[in-house]
Amino acid sequence: MKESWHVERVEEAEEFWRGERLDRGGAFQTVRCTEISGSERRSLEVDVAIEERVALILDGMMVAELFCLPSQLEELAVGHLLCEGHLRGIEDLVSARVAGKEIFCEGRGGGMKVEARPTASDLRISPEAVFKALDMINDAALVWRRTGGTHSALVLGEEGALSSFCEDVSRSSAVDKAVGSALMAGADPSRSVLITTGRLSSAIVSKAGMAGIPVLVSRAGPLNAGIELAERLGMTLAAFARRPNLYVYAGKERIL
């Protein structure tokens, strides 16, 4: 991969990412910048990811303002409500509707947030399944290749089957979208693995725990609070996942 992998150099219009099929409307825009390299300067045309703010409204009350790519907004809303405890499960969702930069949802939770509960899932996953999932991310992250400005997240089912893949400018929104997409498609969270490119903070661990997903993996690093929360919830937490190495900080029994 070239050093300036996310730009189209004026003299090198054949760069590989420009030839890729990309159907993610509103994901990026083209701007001009100046490259300074030593004493040389030149004008470049580059793609940058688009960040927008959307309001999430549940039962007539705004519960969050989310910063995100302006795509997969229904999945974002559903995932956020599940990952933040506004819904106990996908069965509590009555409806979700996108109207411009607002997402209107109805639920059966009565406005009461739930707490994450420790998991007793006996799910097992092999390191190779994790590495194959990271290969999927590398292949599927088209917006990242165009812009260098997104995080990715995916959800695996049993035996490494792909349930969902999502990109977003926010690592939290990428996780929300991936979880929402997977659960809307019928995935069983207790038999699922969440893999992300972002660091494993307590906020990200909490999202997985709230959704009922027992295994969380990242190719980035963990934070101490994320490790402590994973231990309290009985989750498996692994980081710095790069073939052939996988570093497990909690719940090593789920890694085959």
Features from the language model and the residues they span:
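Intrinsically disordered, low-complexity regions enriched in acidic/Ser/Thr/Pro/Gln residues
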Residues: 2-158, 162-165
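Glycine-centered flexibility sites
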Residues: 79, 85, 148-149, 180, ...
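A general structural motif
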Residues: 137, 141-149, 167-179, 197-199
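Feature captures the catalytic cores and cofactor-binding loops of soluble hydro-lyases/lyases
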Residues: 171-248
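Short, basic/aromatic-enriched C-terminal tail that caps enzymatic domains
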Residues: 246-256
